[in-house]
């Protein structure tokens, strides 16, 4: 299996499976002399870690990261810094229950990658989905924590803005509220509603989808390049690599189709700090290049395919059968995808930041 690496100058290669010994990644292209410890990474991993509420999978993984390479104590200050060489990160798996999947090893789970992996490779790791499991995203979050260190002046934040058909009230958006509830929801009232709503979904053995919004503030104008290296193109592609993501939009996105030209175009005026925009329908990107406005990306996450309901399927021999998935699963996988979306945003921005320095010397 190839294509386990993303990025151009800031490159991330991930490895490992859901029920393997460990998962991990190698981050290549990180500049030297950046202070970096395991504690710098652990905070982001803890936000994504499973089993922290009844609304996520009850798999108990501590997700303790180990830095294997690419750092050393600065010879003068003693502070641990990056060396410019590949940074190896490892996260051990400690709470696998492969026996939960023994009954489905010959059946394809509807909505999962079982059928397509088997069609391509002739076999699949049925134990928790193997490489296709969202377990892999822990490594991206670890890489994203390093990317944030490359971009100290950029703040990347994410939130859940819709669950099922229920959207937040944007007039009540409060970033501080995101850390106060298990849904990463910026609307206090809607977070309380989601608690009751998702409890009902969870107890019925079903699942529900969500829409997440990732915002990067402090991004300088000029990142990205025309045509085939557009910043928004890379962001959309990065978000689409996240498990269960089925749609991505930048700025106004699909909503722009409902606007007139005068409504959609972000007008400009001269301000104290240079050019300022009167709106941000573009989501901080024009012509594939950042404008200096906040970069705004939203993506839709489908309902978790593993549900406690019988489903029609076929087996490896091509016979019709039924399947009911056991194991521990998220009733709304979109919840824990918020830190993953933040990580992918940070990695893409770090990549473009380094590429921009090489191209125009900023």
Curated annotation (Swiss-Prot):
A GO CC term assigned to this protein in UniProt: cytosol
Domain of life: Bacteria
Family, as annotated: Belongs to the chorismate synthase family.
Record Pfam families: Chorismate_synt
GO biological processes: amino acid biosynthetic process; aromatic amino acid family biosynthetic process; chorismate biosynthetic process
Reactions it catalyzes: 5-O-(1-carboxyvinyl)-3-phosphoshikimate = chorismate + phosphate
Name this polypeptide is given: Chorismate synthase
Record note on quaternary structure: Homotetramer.
SUPFAM superfamilies to which the protein is assigned, alphabetical: Chorismate synthase, AroC
Cofactor: binding details: Reduced FMN (FMNH(2)).
Xref: InterPro entries: Chorismate_synth (IPR000453), Chorismate_synth_AroC_sf (IPR035904), Chorismate_synthase_CS (IPR020541)
Chain sites annotated for binding NADP(+): 48, 54
Pathways per UniProt: Metabolic intermediate biosynthesis; chorismate biosynthesis; chorismate from D-erythrose 4-phosphate and phosphoenolpyruvate: step 7/7
Entry EC number(s): 4.2.3.5
Keyword Hydrolase: no
Any GO MF annotation of the entry: chorismate synthase activity
Top-level enzyme category: lyase
């Amino acid at each position: 299996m190839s294509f386990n690496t993303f990025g151009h100058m800031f490159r991330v290669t991930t490895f490992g499976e859901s029920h393997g010994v460990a998962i991990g990644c190698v981050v290549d292209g990180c500049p030297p002399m950046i202070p970096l410890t395991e504690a710098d990474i652990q905070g982001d991993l803890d936000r994504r870690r499973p089993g922290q509420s009844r609304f996520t999978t009850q798999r108990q993984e501590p997700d303790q990261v180990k830095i294997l390479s690419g750092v050393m104590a600065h010879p003068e200050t003693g502070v641990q810094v990056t060396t410019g060489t590949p940074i190896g990160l490892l996260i051990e798996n400690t709470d696998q229950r492969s026996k939960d999947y023994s009954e489905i090893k010959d059946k394809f789970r509807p909505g999962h990658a079982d059928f397509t992996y088997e069609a391509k490779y002739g076999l699949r790791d049925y134990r928790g989905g193997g490489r296709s499991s969202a377990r892999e995203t822990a490594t991206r979050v670890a890489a994203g924590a390093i990317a944030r260190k490359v971009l100290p002046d950029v703040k990347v934040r994410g939130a859940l803005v819709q669950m099922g058909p229920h959207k937040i009230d944007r007039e009540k958006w409060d970033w501080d509220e995101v850390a106060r509830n298990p849904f990463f929801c910026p609307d206090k009232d809607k977070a309380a509603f989601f608690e009751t709503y998702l409890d009902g979904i969870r107890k019925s053995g079903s699942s529900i989808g969500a829409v997440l919004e990732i915002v990067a503030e402090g991004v300088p104008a000029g990142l990205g390049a025309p045509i085939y290296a557009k910043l928004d193109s890379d962001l959309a592609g990065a978000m689409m690599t996240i498990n269960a993501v089925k749609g991505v939009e930048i700025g106004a996105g699909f909503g722009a189709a409902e606007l007139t030209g005068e409504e959609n175009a972000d007008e400009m005026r001269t301000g104290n700090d240079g050019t300022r925009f009167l709106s941000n329908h573009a989501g901080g990107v024009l012509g594939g290049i950042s404008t200096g406005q906040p970069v705004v990306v939203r993506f839709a996450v489908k309902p978790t395919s593993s549900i406690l309901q019988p489903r029609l399927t076929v087996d490896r021999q091509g016979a019709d059968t039924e399947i009911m998935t056991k194991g521990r699963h998220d009733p709304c996988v979109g919840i824990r995808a918020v830190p993953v979306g933040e990580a992918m945003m940070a990695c893409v921005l770090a990549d473009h930041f380094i590429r921009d320095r090489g191209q125009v010397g900023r």
